[in-house]
Amino acid sequence: MLMKFKNFYPKVNKKAWIAPSADVIGNIDIGENSSVWFNCVLRADVNAIKIGKCTNIQDLSMIHTDVDNQTIIGNNVTIAHKVMLHGCTIEDNCLIGMSATILDNVVIGRGSIVGANSLVTSGKIFPPNSLIFGTSI
């Protein structure tokens, strides 16, 4: 469901797809050929969420922002099932594994992989083509 929050209504490219049970709220921009799958919550109430082209946000994922940090997801990104992203940047061509959590001010460089169940703590910056896995990274 697309929902307005304050003066912001989500902008979804006409070639993107949103599952009927997904909640897409507020200041969100979703690019061409991207998809948001079942039971996802994308909530841009305090800052913007930007999703590039050909990106997929899989079932049960949660994407939020911080007052000081937008959440930016590049082109050709896969966000696997049950991922949580909060106020971070995921550059182009990345894979974020199932149940990973990525917190505020993190930058995942283009072409990187974050392993399933990983916890990436605030402020970490990873160069392109990184392999990131584990907890308290």
Predicted segments with their positions:
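Glycine-rich hexapeptide-repeat left-handed beta-helix
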Residues: 1-13, 45-61, 65-66, 70-75, ...
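Extended, small-residue-rich solenoid/repeat segments and analogous flexible loops
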Residues: 1-35, 39-41
